[in-house]
Structure formats: structure tokens, C-alpha cells
UniProtKB/Swiss-Prot annotation:
InterPro entries: CHDC, ChdC/CLD, Dimeric_a/b-barrel. Keywords: Heme, Heme biosynthesis, Iron, Metal-binding, Oxidoreductase. Fe-coproporphyrin III binds at residues 130, 144-148, 171, 184, 222. It comes from Geobacillus stearothermophilus (strain DSM 13240 / CIP 106956 / 10). Belongs to the ChdC family. Type 1 subfamily. This is Coproheme decarboxylase. Its EC number is 1.3.98.5. It holds the Pfam family Chlor_dismutase. Pathway: Porphyrin-containing compound metabolism; protoheme biosynthesis. The lineage of its organism: Bacteria, Bacillati, Bacillota, Bacilli, Bacillales. The keyword Transmembrane helix does not apply. Involved in coproporphyrin-dependent heme b biosynthesis. Catalyzes the decarboxylation of Fe-coproporphyrin III (coproheme) to heme b (protoheme IX), the last step of the pathway. The reaction occurs in a stepwise manner with a three-propionate harderoheme intermediate. Fe-coproporphyrin III acts both as a substrate and a redox cofactor. GO terms for molecular function: heme binding; metal ion binding; oxidoreductase activity, acting on the CH-CH group of donors, oxygen as acceptor; peroxidase activity.
Length: 248
């Protein structure tokens, strides 16, 4: 039996995608729309406080295309806290007009494919920064779930640890070419959602998503073993722009 990779696990993550029922939203009197927006912004203020205390992070993006209209990405120390946030959002007036489109539950993950020393990795500042990240405030976001293939000779889970480590090392070298252009957060979801990992990319240049993903397709680990779900791409929604976004 092949050796399982050990993981370092950080904050839990929820990608909550919604579509907006614009037709119903337009029927609300203006005062009620403004009250709903104010209530939502008060909720986000709570998220901002949590982020300032480095007890979690969040991002809000509007999604381009018809798969969804808006994304709430939330990071918290526990699954219970994610559930509380999701429930609190669902109880707002605005949520009456936010229809579920897609969701993904996972946990920020680093694997042990790259060898490390004897030091406790959870005490290394750079490791902690990656496990408990404050999400970038970039202009664009790209999210997609993925699996490792388990078919015939292309069965990732039948490879030895050494083979997997070498393939991931080469894959990581491709990613490092985009340092400073794209920030990547990998979240593990085996046993938590339908795919095995979620990949979230942040950049101020959306074209870098295409370039990075395309170049990585030529890495053996992706060409032989990568299987992908739907891609979601969006633009950042600053809180000062929420009122204008929902204005009708």
C-alpha cells in the first residue's frame, strides 16, 4: 500500500456562491432595500473585526457569467464558526434575494511532499502565514475544485511517495514562476465535499489565471492526474460599492 501524504491543516474555508433574484429585489420599496443593505454591511463589519484580530478572513467578489452573481469566501478556525456565519447571513433580509448557486467546504492545507526538518512546522512563521492567511484584496479571483485521477495506470493513489513528491515538486516550480502575479490558496476537502481539493487564485490581472492554469496543464501531474470541476471567476466588491451594486 502506498504511503499517504500527511497534511498541515489551517483554517476552515467556505466558498458560498449565490445568484441574486433581481426581479424580486426590484419590487422592494427603496427604504427596505436600503435597510437590507445596511443590515448586511453591519454583518460584514463583524467579519472585518474578526479579520483585524487575525481570527479569520473573508472576501466578497461578484462573479462574471451565469454560474453565480456573488461569492462570499470565509475562513475561520472551526467548522462551527463557518456554519454560524452562513446561518447569520441567511437570516438577513438581503439573503431573501440571494439564491444558493454553489458552495464548497474545505480546510486550508499544506502537504508534506516537500521534505522538511524536525522543527514543529506549526511554529514556523511562513507556514503559519500560509495556513492562517489574510485573504488578498486583489481585483480578481478564480476558484475551481479538482481531483487526482484514479484510473488504470493513471492512479495517483497507487504511486509511491517518492514519485508523488517528484511530480509535485515539478508542479510547484511552475507555480513559482507566477510569484508576485498570482496568490494561490489550496484547501483540502477529502471527506468534506465532492472534490478532493479547492484551488483559489487571486490576482490584479485576470489574464494571469489563464496563463498559470494553461502552463500547469503541461506538468505531468496535471496532464496525467488532474481532473477539474467548474471554474468561477469574479471581480472584487469593496464594501463602499455594495450600495451601488445593489442599486436598481
Amino acid at each position: 500500500m502506498s504511503e499517504a501524504a500527511q497534511t498541515l491543516d489551517g483554517w476552515y474555508c467556505l466558498h458560498d456562491f449565490r445568484t441574486i433574484d433581481w426581479s424580486a429585489w426590484k419590487t422592494l420599496p427603496n427604504e427596505e432595500r436600503e435597510a437590507a443593505i445596511s443590515e448586511f454591511l453591519a454583518l460584514v463589519d463583524q467579519w472585518e473585526t474578526t479579520e483585524s484580530e487575525k481570527q479569520g478572513s473573508h472576501a466578497v467578489y461578484t462573479i462574471v457569467g451565469q454560474k453565480a452573481d456573488i461569492l462570499f469566501m470565509i475562513l475561520r478556525p472551526t467548522l462551527d464558526e463557518l456554519h454560524e456565519i452562513e446561518t447569520a447571513l441567511n437570516k438577513t433580509k438581503l439573503a431573501d434575494y440571494l439564491l444558493p448557486a454553489y458552495s464548497y467546504v474545505s480546510v486550508v492545507e499544506l502537504s508534506n511532499y516537500l521534505a522538511s526538518g524536525s522543527e514543529d512546522p506549526y511554529q514556523i512563521p511562513e507556514v503559519r502565514r500560509r495556513l492562517y492567511p489574510i485573504l488578498p484584496k486583489t481585483n480578481y479571483i478564480c476558484f475551481y475544485p479538482m481531483d487526482k485521477r484514479r484510473q488504470g495506470n493513471d492512479n495517483w493513489y497507487m504511486l509511491s511517495m517518492e514519485q508523488r513528491r517528484e511530480l509535485m515538486r515539478a508542479h510547484g516550480m511552475t507555480g513559482r514562476k507566477y510569484a508576485g502575479k498570482v496568490t494561490q490558496i489550496i484547501t483540502g476537502s477529502v471527506g468534506l465535499d465532492d472534490f478532493e481539493w479547492g484551488v483559489t487564485l487571486f490576482s490584479d490581472d485576470a489574464l494571469q489565471f489563464k496563463k498559470l492554469v494553461y502552463e500547469m496543464r503541461f506538468d505531468e501531474v496535471s496532464a496525467r492526474f488532474g481532473e477539474f470541476g467548474s471554474f468561477f471567476v469574479g471581480t472584487r466588491l469593496p464594501m463602499e460599492n455594495v450600495s451601488s451594486f445593489f442599486h436598481v
